[in-house]
């Protein structure tokens, strides 16, 4: 056997790519040579065998041994004579020959398939016309050696024709190439090349592509589109003649580079160039695959002419290529590895450019030979081969990855190149930035799309609402859980409040701030402000005081409408008049004011600002009137419709909820505060009120869909007629799931705050949804009197399919930014296509689709939206940089794991900090400071300290290199054993979206929570064909412990999780005891595992039924004593005080939205039975658990919960607090904090020292996984102190 050789040059990459690919023939290369003339086929067949025998790489065998791949020359391999096939009598000789060759290529031709890696056929299709088919595996040849072998066979054939001996082999043994390559890898030259490419990478611009699909995450494909562009009409030749000082190859390259740059909308980009890697090397005459594709930056100036571009490219590229050739032996794969890029990351380059210098001409007397390429191996994006010929013409062959391109698009792109050449032929002095890439007819197409002119009346919101109220005075207009107003009654309330505003000094043109919870009074307040001629300024009471103060300082409203409990938050805002409003007013019978004018500002909404300060967007009456009239025309409401108001008033989508129903005679129903965050609450809300029209942010739609079963969808969604989505990209798969579950029509809307809510629309159901090919539904077509423009960097329109910057025009544009004329001027610019008009740059990147709709592709800056909330990462960065001892700070949005993913946008904010002093930062304390300044949706869920921020090759921040927060076991243990442990580990992985290779991996530390525990139990029950309960998952939450239980006796473990002691985690240090809430179960505390340091044990204390302390005790003191007897414990209302009385140390006492029993009337609650809200909460939990376990949950659990709730009320009727002389930490649920309730006052008689952390959630959510994202780190920091 010959010497075993390692794989070298391109071979390792080819081997690995084939192993990872599921395509059977991706790495085969093939062409056929069309021979016209008299051919001696048997003699040519002999020449083929002789020629193949001279190239030793064609006799290579490959084997894998202990992870290493070896190759050797099989000297015993004998090539058979190629088959000669005569198709002259066939009906379609050419088609049949093509089918034969393609059939060969469609076989499994992988290197280990057993099929020949080398294959030739001679197919006669006519007298004196042959197809010589040749196919090789890419491990044996490359694009240089393939034609070289063909030429050598032709030489042998000619010698045989002349009766001469077979010419000697011109090919170098591949062993010489391997030896030389190994020496190179160990040489200083390799080190110099590595250093050269490190520096090259630093200067390299980003890659570009003609496809809108991202380059990252896409693999090469052997499914390829081929397009040959022939420029034989003389225009390239004419241009070359006019530019006589420019080489034809340089001109061809300049035209192609400019064409790519303009169609990519990127004038600086990285392209791939093919290097032979043979000159001065043993590989010069070897046949193995040694070609290299290396990155090179292309730089185009918009203000230069084509001759200047060609000359500069030629000069610069010549110098650059000369340097690169000295370092061309360095593997492209090694450059990628050196850059730190992982598989699936963005590649170094997109399109590959290749000016063909390989000689495909065959010198056979009396025979013309033309080569036709069939397969060249996989293509990542585009490969362009340029063929400038000796006649002065140009042809370009395009190979395109079919996963990224379609044939009509490629043909259009080819037409644009022809048009580009024609423009330069007509005017060689034309600037590169001014050349037109729009095809004839495309301007008219875009003009037709934007032909949205519709005459609308000159009116205002208040006038439209008053007009409808006069038509249907007795129809129901506005309702919440407590009130119902007819149109007449609502109008009377609005006028009464508007007059009160006037009395308080509000004048037309003023602004009025509103800080009210969601109720009928919020709607009435907004309408009254408009009635008084003012603009409303919504204040989200969930925002920190500092941020609200900034908004008020900038807006300077003439009045604040709020409630008594919120008023203290604004006490330090100077010169702010206030009005507390939470009850109906007595109608005065006054005439309507209707002081608004069409030119007035209707509302001011603050959005995130990159400067670190929020910016107020002012939207006028005419803009929002246009938006509402369009919506009523396009999606008409009637008096039978019920519209849900569930969007927070600080989000501009709420505007149409507050006003659209009242211009159409429909009814608006107000969801309870924060109900929009609870899918089960929304199900009940829709069903109770018969809602027909509602809105979801896509991520909340995903959560709502996840909560539905076919049965609950029929119950809660049956009345829905139209559902709207906006605020984020809308996943097409989510729409399909919604359609299958509910059948309710879904509509995608798009628009920034700066353009009256929405400016475009697209159906997200039915036939339109079926035609969506991308991952997201298009943002669609413009609304009335509005235009969409997609422009390149030179402000030229881009053609369909080409990515560009999205601009908005028309009547709906905002008036500007409050008090920021500089920012207004920079974002609302003059419209170059409509003199005297304005245009707003959205910062969104988009493209036109063939049907005229717009597809959103992403952002061109650091702004993003998460669950509909606009976020400027720069604003968070600046606030973090102001924190103590922080030198550098950056924010990144990422999916931490899949446990929280619901099919929508699962990204969360992570903050990265670099310390000024180099000392460890107290990230929990810093996070608490951020909550005092930033609204909840802008506070990173976790802060990570880094020694330094990662930089990309060009010295910029490399966001992709920022580490993800690790939610995993602290130290690796043994691997799961085959059997139960392996099955359980796989179940963990599938539910949590992370790799589980440790038998001690904890389900909750990895991101699980109680609902996911339900799903896990249901899944394992099916897999093991025995009942696995959620309680067992709670108690035995690691892979190994759960396997032990499942493999043990079923009866003995069934009560696990339902006992008094709930061991949630075992550590080697102190223990945190978690007392059950009124439900009697402590399962919700399972998520604490992911926040507390590993030495902490976590134990839940429960009250199961029957015989639990809550059921058997006559008063709360007995419950406390019973639990104290079970374990030394800390808990309000007695346990902590009892421990102190016994002389025990209480290191930490935590209270989760807990209040002294003396602050409420528990006797009245007991007399009235279980609170409806409590029953609703239990029902929501039941529905969620049933959905998680697919209906298999026992009713016993919820019977116990209901019993415990009733007992809790009974026990609290006689309970009395006991003073505690230590320190406690109280977490207050702000959203359900009763008016006038002060936690400081309520607890001051009973607790000596109290730390209070206000949480942006409701009481029912205080122990939810979402709440523990904020609470968990605070508990950890407190315990560590």
Swiss-Prot record:
Q: Does the keyword Phosphoprotein apply?
A: yes
| Location (main, coarse) | cytoplasm
Q: Which reaction does it catalyse?
A: 3 2,3-dihydroxybenzoate + 3 L-serine + 6 ATP = enterobactin + 6 AMP + 6 diphosphate + 4 H(+); holo-[peptidyl-carrier protein] + L-serine + ATP = L-seryl-[peptidyl-carrier protein] + AMP + diphosphate
Sequence intervals crossing the membrane: none
As stated in the Swiss-Prot or TrEMBL entry, residues carrying the post-translational modification O-(pantetheine 4'-phosphoryl)serine are: 1010
Q: Where is this region: Elongation/condensation?
A: 1-301
What pathway does this protein act in?
A: Siderophore biosynthesis; enterobactin biosynthesis
GO cellular component annotations, sorted alphabetically? Answer: cytosol; enterobactin synthetase complex; plasma membrane
| One BP annotation, GO | enterobactin biosynthetic process
Entry GO MF terms: 2,3-dihydroxybenzoate-serine ligase activity; ATP binding; nucleotidyltransferase activity; phosphopantetheine binding
Q: How is the cofactor bound?
A: Binds 1 phosphopantetheine covalently.
Q: Name one Pfam family in it.
A: Condensation
Indicate yes or no for the key word Cytoplasm.
yes
Q: Give EC number(s), comma-separated.
A: 6.3.2.14, 6.2.1.72
Q: Where in the cell is it found?
A: Cytoplasm
**Ranges for the Carrier domain?**
975-1050
Q: Where is this region: Adenylation?
A: 486-891
Family membership, please give it.
Answer: Belongs to the ATP-dependent AMP-binding enzyme family. EntF subfamily.
**Protein name per its UniProtKB record:** Enterobactin synthase component F
Q: Which organism is it from?
A: Shigella flexneri
* This protein's encoding gene: entF
């Amino acid at each position: 056997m010959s010497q075993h050789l390692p794989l070298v040059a391109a071979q390792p990459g080819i081997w690995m790519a084939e192993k990872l690919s599921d395509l059977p023939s991706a790495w085969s290369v093939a062409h056929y040579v069309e021979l016209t003339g008299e051919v001696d086929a048997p003699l040519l067949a002999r020449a083929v065998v002789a020629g193949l025998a001279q190239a030793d790489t064609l006799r290579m065998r490959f084997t894998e041994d202990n992870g290493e791949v070896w190759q050797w020359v099989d000297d015993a391999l004998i090539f058979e004579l190629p088959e000669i096939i005569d198709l002259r009598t066939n009906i379609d000789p050419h088609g049949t020959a093509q089918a034969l060759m393609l059939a060969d290529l469609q076989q499994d031709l992988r290197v280990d398939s057993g099929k020949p890696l080398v294959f030739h056929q001679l197919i006669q299709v006519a007298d004196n016309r042959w197809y010589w088919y040749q196919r090789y595996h890419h491990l044996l040849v490359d694009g240089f050696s393939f034609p070289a072998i063909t030429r050598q066979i032709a030489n042998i054939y000619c010698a045989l024709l002349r009766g001469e001996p077979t010419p000697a082999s011109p090919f170098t043994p591949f062993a010489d190439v391997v030896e030389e390559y190994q020496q190179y890898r160990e040489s200083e030259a390799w080190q110099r090349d590595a250093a050269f490419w490190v520096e090259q990478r630093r200067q390299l611009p980003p890659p570009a592509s003609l496809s809108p699909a991202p380059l990252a995450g896409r693999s090469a494909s052997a499914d390829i589109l081929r397009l040959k562009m022939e420029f034989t009409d003389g225009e390239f030749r004419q241009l070359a003649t006019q530019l006589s000082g420019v080489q034809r190859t340089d001109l061809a390259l300049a035209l192609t580079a400019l064409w790519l740059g303009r169609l990519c909308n990127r004038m600086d980009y990285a392209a791939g160039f093919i290097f032979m890697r043979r000159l001065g090397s043993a590989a010069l005459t070897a046949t193995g695959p040694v070609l290299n594709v290396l990155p090179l930056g292309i730089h185009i100036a918009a203000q230069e002419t084509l001759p200047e571009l060609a000359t500069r490219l030629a000069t610069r590229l010549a110098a650059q290529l000369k340097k690169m050739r000295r370092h061309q032996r360095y593997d492209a794969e090694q450059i990628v590895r050196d850059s730190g890029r992982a598989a699936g990351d963005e590649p170094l380059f997109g399109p590959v450019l290749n000016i063909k210098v390989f000689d495909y001409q065959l010198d056979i007397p009396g025979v013309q030979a033309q080569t036709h390429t069939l397969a060249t191996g996989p293509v990542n994006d585009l490969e362009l081969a340029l063929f400038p010929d000796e006649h002065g013409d140009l042809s370009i062959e395009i190979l395109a990855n079919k996963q990224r391109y379609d044939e009509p698009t490629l043909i259009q792109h080819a037409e644009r190149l022809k048009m580009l050449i024609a423009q330069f032929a007509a005017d060689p002095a034309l600037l590169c930035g001014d050349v037109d890439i729009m095809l004839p007819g495309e301007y008219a197409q875009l003009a037709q799309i934007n032909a949205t002119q519709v005459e609308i009346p000159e009116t205002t919101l208040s006038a439209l609402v008053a007009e409808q109220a006069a038509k249907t005075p007795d129809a129901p207009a506005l309702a919440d859980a407590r009130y119902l107003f007819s149109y007449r009654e609502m109008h009377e309330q609005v006028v009464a409040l508007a007059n009160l505003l006037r009395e308080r000094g509000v004048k037309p043109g003023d602004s009025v701030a509103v800080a009210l919870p969601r109720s009928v009074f919020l709607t009435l307040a907004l309408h009254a402000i408009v009635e008084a001629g003012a603009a409303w300024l919504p204040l989200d009471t969930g925002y920190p005081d500092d941020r609200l103060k900034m908004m008020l300082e900038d807006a300077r409203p003439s009045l604040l409408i709020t409630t008594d409990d919120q008023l203290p938050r604004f006490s330090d805002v100077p010169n702010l008049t206030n009005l507390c409003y939470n009850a109906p007013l007595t109608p005065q019978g006054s005439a309507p004011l209707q002081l608004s004018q069409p030119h007035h500002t209707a509302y001011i909404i603050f959005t995130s600002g990159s400067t670190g300060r929020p910016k107020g967007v002012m939207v006028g009456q005419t803009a929002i009137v246009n938006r509402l009239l369009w919506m009523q025309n396009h999606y008409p409401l009637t008096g039978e419709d019920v519209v849900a108001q569930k969007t927070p008033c600080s989000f501009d989508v709420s505007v149409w909820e507050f006003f659209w129903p009242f211009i159409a005679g429909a009814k608006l129903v107000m969801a309870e505060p924060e109900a929009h965050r609870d899918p089960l609450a929304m199900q009940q809300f829709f069903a109770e009120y018969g809602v027909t029209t509602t809105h979801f942010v896509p991520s909340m739609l995903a959560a709502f869909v996840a909560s539905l079963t076919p049965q609950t969808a029929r119950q809660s969604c049956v009345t829905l007629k139209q559902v709207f989505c906006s605020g984020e990209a809308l996943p097409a798969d989510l729409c399909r799931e919604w359609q299958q579950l509910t059948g309710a029509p879904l509509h995608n809307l798009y628009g920034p705050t700066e353009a009256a809510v929405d400016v475009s629309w697209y159906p997200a159901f039915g036939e339109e949804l079926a035609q969506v090919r991308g991952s997201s539904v298009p943002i669609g077509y413009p609304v009335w009197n509005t235009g969409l423009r997609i422009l390149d960097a030179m402000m030229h329109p881009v053609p369909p399919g080409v990515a560009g910057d999205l601009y908005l025009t028309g009547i709906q544009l905002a008036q500007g930014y409050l008090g920021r004329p500089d920012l207004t001027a920079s974002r609302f610019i003059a419209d170059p296509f409509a003199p005297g008009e304005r245009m707003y740059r959205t910062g969104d990147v988009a493209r036109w689709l063939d049907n005229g709709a717009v597809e959103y592709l992403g952002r061109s800056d650091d702004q993003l939206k998460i669950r509909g909330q606009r976020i400027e990462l720069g604003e968070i960065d600046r606030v973090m940089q102001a924190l103590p001892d922080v030198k550098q700070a950056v924010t990144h949005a990422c999916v931490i794991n899949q446990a929280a993913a619901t099919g929508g946008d699962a990204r969360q904010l992570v903050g990265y900090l670099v310390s000024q002093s180099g000392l460890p930062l107290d990230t929990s304390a810093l996070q608490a400071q951020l909550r005092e300044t930033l609204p909840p949706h802008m506070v990173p869920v976790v802060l990570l300290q880094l020694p330094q921020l990662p930089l990309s090759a060009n010295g910029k921040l490399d966001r992709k290199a920022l580490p993800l927060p690790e939610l995993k076991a602290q130290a690796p243990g043994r691997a799961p054993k085959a059997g139960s442990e392996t099955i359980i580990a796989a179940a963990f992985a599938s539910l949590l979206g992370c790799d589980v290779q440790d038998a001690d991996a904890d389900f909750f530390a990895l991101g699980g929570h109680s609902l996911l525990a339900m799903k896990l139990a249901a899944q394992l029950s099916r897999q093991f064909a025995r009942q696995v309960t959620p309680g067992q998952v709670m108690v035995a939450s690691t892979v190994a412990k759960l396997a032990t239980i499942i493999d043990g006796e079923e009866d003995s473990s069934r009560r696990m999780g339902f006992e008094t002691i709930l061991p949630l985690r075992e550590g080697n240090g102190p223990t945190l005891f978690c007392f059950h809430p009124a439900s009697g179960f402590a399962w919700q505390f399972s998520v604490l595992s992911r926040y507390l340091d590993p030495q902490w044990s976590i134990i839940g204390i429960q009250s199961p039924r029957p015989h639990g302390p809550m059921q058997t005790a006559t008063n709360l003191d007995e419950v406390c004593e019973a639990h104290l007897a079970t374990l030394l414990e800390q808990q309000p209302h007695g346990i902590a005080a009892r421990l102190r009385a016994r002389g025990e140390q209480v290191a930490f006492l935590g209270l989760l939205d807990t209040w002294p029993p003396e602050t409420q009337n528990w006797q009245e609650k007991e007399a009235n039975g279980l609170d409806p809200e409590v029953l609703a909460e239990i029902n929501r939990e039941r529905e969620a658990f049933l959905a998680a376990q697919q209906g298999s949950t026992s009713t016993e659990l919820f019977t116990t919960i209901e019993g415990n709730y009733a007992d809790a009320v009974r026990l609290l009727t006689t309970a009395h607090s006991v003073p505690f002389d230590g320190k406690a930490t109280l977490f207050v649920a702000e959203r359900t904090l009763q008016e006038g309730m002060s936690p400081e006052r309520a607890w001051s008689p009973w607790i000596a020292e109290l730390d209070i952390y206000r949480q942006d959630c409701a009481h029912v959510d205080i122990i939810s996984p979402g709440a523990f994202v904020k609470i968990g780190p605070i508990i950890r920091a407190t315990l560590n102190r």
